[in-house]
From Swiss-Prot:
<comment type="pathway">
    <text>Protein modification; protein glycosylation.</text>
</comment>
<feature type="glycosylation site" description="N-linked (GlcNAc...) asparagine">
    <location>
        <position position="50"/>
    </location>
</feature>
<keyword id="KW-1133">Transmembrane helix</keyword>
<dbReference type="GO" id="GO:0097503">
    <property type="term" value="P:sialylation"/>
</dbReference>
<dbReference type="GO" id="GO:0005576">
    <property type="term" value="C:extracellular region"/>
</dbReference>
<feature type="binding site">
    <location>
        <position position="281"/>
    </location>
    <ligand>
        <name>CMP-N-acetyl-beta-neuraminate</name>
    </ligand>
</feature>
<dbReference type="Pfam" id="PF00777">
    <property type="entry name" value="Glyco_transf_29"/>
</dbReference>
<feature type="disulfide bond">
    <location>
        <begin position="156"/>
        <end position="356"/>
    </location>
</feature>
<feature type="binding site">
    <location>
        <position position="279"/>
    </location>
    <ligand>
        <name>CMP-N-acetyl-beta-neuraminate</name>
    </ligand>
</feature>
<feature type="topological domain" description="Lumenal">
    <location>
        <begin position="21"/>
        <end position="359"/>
    </location>
</feature>
<dbReference type="GO" id="GO:0006491">
    <property type="term" value="P:N-glycan processing"/>
</dbReference>
<dbReference type="InterPro" id="IPR001675">
    <property type="entry name" value="Glyco_trans_29"/>
</dbReference>
<feature type="glycosylation site" description="N-linked (GlcNAc...) asparagine">
    <location>
        <position position="219"/>
    </location>
</feature>
<keyword id="KW-0472">Membrane</keyword>
<keyword id="KW-0325">Glycoprotein</keyword>
<feature type="binding site">
    <location>
        <position position="301"/>
    </location>
    <ligand>
        <name>CMP-N-acetyl-beta-neuraminate</name>
    </ligand>
</feature>
<dbReference type="InterPro" id="IPR038578">
    <property type="entry name" value="GT29-like_sf"/>
</dbReference>
């Protein structure tokens, strides 16, 4: 009996020690993670990261402090962020590989699947730019346009088009949504999966004609195709390349460098933003810091409802569903959004999530 009481006493003491030690570690981590990194760059606390859904439930609370009126650019912070990002990547160089990087027949490993390889085809090589499409380019104001349904009824079209340089994601349609999203497109990303999702995998001539028509609207804009990320989209990339060449489209193709995504992730991880893989929107913002003096973001809203509880579509142009908080997702969009919101509040960028003021 005495031995049983002794074991219970030891067990109870052990549990208490574990409990208090855990609390001590949690307090230490919370203190460390709320500190700022470097010379004023951002860091997010774990409590903020874990309370993503509160942004919807507590509209107007301190969880989400966001004010567009009275926003002012913090030029010194913009320069500081640009300088620090340059320690990890140079967007002018890493935005695209160039012809001299490869020759037809070269074999490369996919960036996110090193076991799989890709052969550089003649079509792909012929479409590689001679020099970086962003070489020596600089703009006073840039718009990075995401695809969230938060753009619907925003009336942001004219404001977006007023910027010197407009970046759009995933070849999103613009003409039928011009009042809300504008039409100006200087730099457009296109994941290979878009071919299947938006253009039927080019199964018939009408799908191909629809795609060619969409690209013809871009004129000499930059079409940015992440061709070297993962196995599975290579046939779509080749079909796109073949159609561009066959129809002699003026669009300027670009294919991101093999180091870009890891360099971008490295920058954010260093600043205590624990992303798994940067979303296209975060990638574009990071690149834009190199050649834009003032960056405005639109269509960034990774939540199923707005602050008034109204349903928000994942994309403004389709009915695709997305689980923002799923651990299976390669992205951490709510965390990215909060990071961008912190930067907005500090004047490093302007994040518009509501209606635009008529100019």
């Amino acid at each position: 009996m005495r031995s049983i009481r002794k074991r219970w006493t030891i067990c109870t003491i052990s549990l208490l020690l574990i409990f208090y030690k855990t609390k001590e570690i949690a307090r230490t981590e919370e203190h460390q993670e709320t500190q700022l990194i470097g010379d004023g760059e951002l860091s997010l606390s774990r409590s903020l990261v874990n309370s993503s859904d509160k942004i919807i439930r507590k509209a107007g609370s301190s969880i989400f402090q966001h004010n567009v009126e009275g926003w002012k650019i913090n030029s010194s912070l913009v320069l500081e962020i640009r300088k620090n990002i340059l320690r990890f990547l140079d967007a002018e160089r890493d935005v695209s590989v160039v012809k001299s990087s490869f020759k037809p027949g070269d074999v490369i490993h996919y960036v996110l699947d090193r076991r799989r390889t890709l052969n550089i085809s003649h079509d792909l090589h012929s479409l590689l730019p001679e020099v970086s499409p962003m070489k020596n380019r600089r703009f006073k104001t840039c718009a990075v346009v995401g695809n969230s349904g938060i753009l619907l009824d925003s009336e942001c079209g004219k404001e977006i088009d007023s910027h010197n340089f407009v970046i759009r994601c995933n070849l999103a349609p613009v003409v039928e949504f011009a009042a809300d999203v504008g039409t100006k497109s200087d730099f457009i990303t296109m994941n290979p999966s878009v071919v299947q999702r938006a253009f039927g995998g080019f199964r018939n001539e009408s799908d191909r004609e629809k795609f060619v028509h969409r690209l013809s609207m871009l004129n000499d804009s930059v079409l940015w195709i992440p061709a070297f990320m993962v196995k599975g989209g290579e046939k779509h990339v080749e079909w796109v390349n073949a159609l561009i060449l066959k129809n002699k489209l003026k669009v300027r193709t670009a294919y991101p460098s093999l180091r870009l995504i890891h360099a971008v992730r490295g920058y954010w991880l260093t600043n205590k933003v624990p992303i798994k893989r940067p979303s296209t929107g975060l990638l574009m913002y990071t690149l834009a810091t190199r050649f834009c003096d003032e960056i405005h973001l639109y269509g960034f809203w990774p939540f199923p409802k707005d602050l008034n509880g109204k349903a928000v579509k994942y994309h403004y142009y389709d009915d695709l569903k997305y689980r923002y908080f799923s651990n299976a997702s390669p992205h951490r969009m709510p965390l990215e959004f909060k990071t961008l919101n912190v930067l907005h509040n500090r004047g490093a960028l302007k994040l518009t999530t509501g209606k635009c003021v008529k100019q």
